[in-house]
Design a protein with these regions (language model features):
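Extended alpha-helical solenoid/rod scaffold regions
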Residues: 1-244
């Protein structure tokens, strides 16, 4: 009876009423044998194309997530719903759950948002994965073990090419780890002396230093020449004075 009534509401263009009926079934306020309110709601959103789809999803997703996080998450990443207008509320709903990192990755790779917070969170997640492997801290991409190279290549390319993340926040996340990534972020922040020093003395990679200079410009090339022709590390440190 309730399922039939919900379908009747859909046929009459009253999607909200149908969703309310399925919610009552899903939460046990109404009972009908063989009818799962959660499944009915999820199935509805996969085929409904009304202009109010996004607004309805924002309204009814929380109860679906409370009852079945797995089904709610599967709907969100199914690409059958444009969730770009409601990403913030969804992140609030997911909180610190196990689904959050996968959702952030999905959003970053699916939508052209140019959102600083999401881009920064995405980069932070990837960096923290790499930080679990101390062997990666002082090596270039070419020196990275094959098992980690594809994942690392992805975040290195992201840090170089993405203009949306906060380099200051990412530098804080990096701390003293992952020197290659630090070089890239320091270059973005125009801290060229420190970036080049790490490239030469920690990574021992002139190639990485040159890549830094190509991004930073002529002044960086001058610093690199000074580093390459200085006799000791101490001379370089002294030459920085109060700049560092």
């Amino acid at each position: 009876m309730f399922a039939a009534l919900a379908q009747f509401c859909v046929s009459k263009g009253n999607a909200r009423k149908a969703l309310e009926i399925w919610k009552q079934l899903g939460e046990g306020e109404s009972v009908e044998t063989g009818v799962d309110g959660v499944e009915k709601t999820v199935d509805f959103f996969t085929i409904y194309d009304g202009e109010d789809k996004c607004a309805l999803l924002e309204e009814f997703l929380p109860w679906v997530y409370a009852k079945s996080p797995e089904k709610a998450f599967s709907l969100l990443v199914s690409k059958k719903v444009d969730i770009s207008p409601i990403i913030r509320p969804i992140l609030g709903l997911l909180g610190d759950s196990a689904y959050r990192s996968e959702f952030v990755e999905f959003v970053q790779n699916t939508y052209d948002l140019h959102d600083s917070e999401i881009s920064t969170e995405f980069a932070t997640q990837r960096i923290r994965e790499l930080q679990k492997e101390p062997a990666l801290f002082n090596c270039t991409l070419d020196e990275t073990p094959k098992a980690f190279r594809p994942r690392r290549a992805e975040i290195v390319a992201f840090l170089r090419d993405n203009a949306d993340y906060s380099p200051a926040d990412i530098l804080e996340v990096l701390g003293e780890t992952l020197v290659l990534e630090r070089v890239i972020v320091l270059t973005r922040l125009r801290h060229c002396e420190e970036a080049l020093h790490l490239a030469i003395y920690s990574l021992r990679s002139v190639r990485t230093a040159c890549e830094c200079c190509r991004t930073a410009g002529m002044d960086a090339w001058k610093i690199l020449l000074q580093l390459l022709f200085s006799e000791t590390d101490e001379e370089w440190v002294d030459s920085r004075g109060d700049d560092g």
